[in-house]
């Protein structure tokens, strides 16, 4: 594999507007070939998406999804830049897909990691630091392990970091980036609420994630 220089990453960022990590991945996937990396980013819908992400998105749609049987319901607000895009089939399908994703992810509480309150991160850190498997490790090693575990745990709580139920090879964040590239507007998932019938009442649980994924697959067929 060719060595990927910072200069090459910078050049790719300037040409595509993609994020640094996306550029590094594109170059690694294409053995340092700049043109192939650009094409790879375009195929993934990442190129140019980052450039649009700073623009104001004040239009959009509040979408809903009720799972079969009425046991789980979701409301989600997804913003775009214009009413024209908000009324389009592709944007509305994106909103519905995101709502179905939320229904399938009972552990998700936030849109992105930056939305997680500091006290939750501190609580998770305290839990990890107290685990028995770290008791005999040096302090600096413990800190590194804990940082990695906390990062993983916080991502489990966020919508954008989840594997997309219709295509687990991409994340929800990548799905949104693809839509930004396709529709030519900034798109932001702003907030959501997930309702569960009888929440807080002790009862037998079923695999909602599998059910929603199956329903999504059926809708495509």
From Swiss-Prot:
Superkingdom of the organism of origin: Bacteria
Region (Involved in Mg(2+) ion dislocation from EF-Tu) residue spans: 82-85
Keyword Cytoplasm: yes
InterPro entries xref list: EF-Ts_dimer_sf (IPR036402), Transl_elong_EFTs/EF1B (IPR001816), Transl_elong_EFTs/EF1B_dimer (IPR014039), Transl_elong_Ts_CS (IPR018101), UBA-like_sf (IPR009060)
MF GO annotations: translation elongation factor activity
UniProtKB keywords: Cytoplasm, Elongation factor, Protein biosynthesis
Cellular localization per UniProt: Cytoplasm
Tagged with keyword Coiled coil: no
One Gene Ontology CC term in the entry: cytoplasm
Paired cysteines (S-S): none
Pfam families, per the entry: EF-Ts_N, EF_TS
Protein's job: Associates with the EF-Tu.GDP complex and induces the exchange of GDP to GTP. It remains bound to the aminoacyl-tRNA.EF-Tu.GTP complex up to the GTP hydrolysis stage on the ribosome.
Family per similarity comment: Belongs to the EF-Ts family.
Name the UniProt record assigns to this protein: Elongation factor Ts
Species assigned in the record: Synechococcus elongatus (strain ATCC 33912 / PCC 7942 / FACHB-805) (Anacystis nidulans R2)
């Amino acid at each position: 594999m060719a060595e990927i220089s910072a200069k090459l990453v910078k050049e790719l960022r300037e040409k595509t507007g993609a994020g640094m990590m996306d550029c590094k991945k594109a170059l690694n996937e294409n053995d340092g070939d700049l043109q192939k990396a650009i094409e790879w980013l375009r195929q993934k819908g990442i190129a140019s998406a980052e450039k649009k992400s700073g623009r104001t998105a004040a239009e959009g749609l509040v979408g809903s999804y009720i799972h079969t049987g009425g046991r789980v319901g979701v409301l989600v607000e997804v913003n775009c830049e214009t009413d024209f895009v908000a009324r389009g089939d592709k944007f509305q399908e994106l909103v519905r897909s995101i709502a179905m994703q939320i229904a399938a992810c009972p552990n998700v509480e936030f849109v992105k990691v930056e939305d997680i309150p500091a006290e939750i991160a501190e609580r998770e850190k305290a839990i990890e630091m107290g685990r028995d498997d770290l008791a005999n490790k040096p302090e600096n090693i413990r800190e590194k392990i804990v940082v990695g575990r906390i990062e993983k745990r916080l991502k489990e709580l966020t919508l954008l970091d989840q594997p997309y139920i219709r295509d687990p090879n991409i994340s929800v964040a990548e799905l949104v980036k693809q839509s930004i590239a396709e529709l030519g507007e900034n798109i932001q998932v702003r907030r959501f609420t997930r309702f569960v019938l009888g929440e807080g009442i002790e009862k037998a649980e079923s695999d909602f994630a599998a059910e929603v994924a199956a329903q999504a697959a059926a809708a495509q067929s």
